[in-house]
Amino acid sequence: MQERASLQTSTHDTPASAGDFLNLHEIIAKARQNLNQNDWDYIVGGAESEATLRRNRMALDSLAFRPRVLRDVSKVDCSVTHFGRKLRLPVVLAPVGSLESFHALGAEPVALGVKEFGVAHMLSSVCDPGLEDLAAAAPDALRLYQLYVRGDAGWVDDHVERAIGHGYAGFCLTVDVAHYSRRERDIAKRFVTAGRRRVQGRAFQAALDWTTVKRIKRRFNIPLAIKGIATAEDARVAVDHGVEWIYVSNHGGRQLDHGRGSIEVLPEVVDAVAGRAKIMIDGAFCRGTDIVKAIAAGADLVGMGRMQCFALAAAGQAGVVRMLELLEDEVERCLGLLGVASLAELDRSYLHAAAPTTMPHVLSSFPLLKLDEYHY
């Protein structure tokens, strides 16, 4: 039995089928109805005081737009090209462990939804199905693979070789989990995800250093992303090691508490990289306006983790596709109202520092939700 009343929009029950979702609020509301308290808190929670989680949202809410007018925006193009593929949106569905908590088939409906819509998916190494099974289930999807290091050099190299052999277009090392954080929502309920229960060998992650990056770049021909970059200094080191993708992330506020918001970090990373690598970013990106802000600030791809989980829990593959359709509509409208006909036209001149209009929390971008986020 669910511990909370169902979460609904302010005036209407949530739709029964994915095609009937009219906004992202309704997807989240349906996910809440379908999830037990533990799995819900796994999505919405962060580390310790959840300061980093809230700063992610506050940083996005602290950017306002500077629109231009009297420009032809009768046709707006939201697409980009990365990893040799045209994507309908500059979006990668970010690596999330234990997706099987939100759907019995885990990452499979996500990858199939990504293929159906036309964006990228990054599979977590602590998620079902494994990389071979997902490749078999969604051979034509744009698949990337993210690894938590739980073994020695040979173990890591084996994962790279398997990813290459099964058609993954990129390989990602997560580097901000040298120690596992205190996620106090989970601790309070003695809840341990399936991904955490089966994972061993965390000492290898704690000992990880730049020699692993150097070895991967020397031995393998696959685009490499480093996930967890939060400073200009580390971005420069990564680029000096030949890393193709700098992934700005604080693990969604789920690792180091009292960190900066991801989009606060982005400008210094963009300046440090100076065009020598592409940039991904995640951390509270959940609306089309958030995606536009990230691209204007210098990112190339925007990772979306929590929205992926909500969509998966709401309606499986169809929910993922509908979530992406709604995001595309939001991005297209935002660009048109900014006076911009394509993402390539965006730059920092379209952004302005401003005071947030609401107190930030993980779902403060969805004011129509009936949610007391502070009690669980």
Report residues per predicted region:
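An N-cap/entry alpha-helix motif that binds or orients negatively charged groups
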Residues: 2-84, 183, 192-203, 207-208, ...
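Conserved active-site and cofactor/substrate-binding residues in soluble primary-metabolism enzymes
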Residues: 22, 47, 51-55, 105, ...
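Glycine-rich active-site/cofactor-binding loop and its immediate structural neighborhood
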Residues: 87-129
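Short, basic, glycine/proline-bearing loop/turn elements
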Residues: 92-98, 141-148, 198
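Alpha/beta enzyme core
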Residues: 98, 111-112, 133-137, 151-281, ...
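A gly/proline- and charged-residue-enriched helix-loop-helix capping module
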Residues: 116-137, 141-156
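A compact, surface-exposed functional segment
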Residues: 293-320, 353-357, 370-376
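Internal helix-turn-beta structural module
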Residues: 317-358
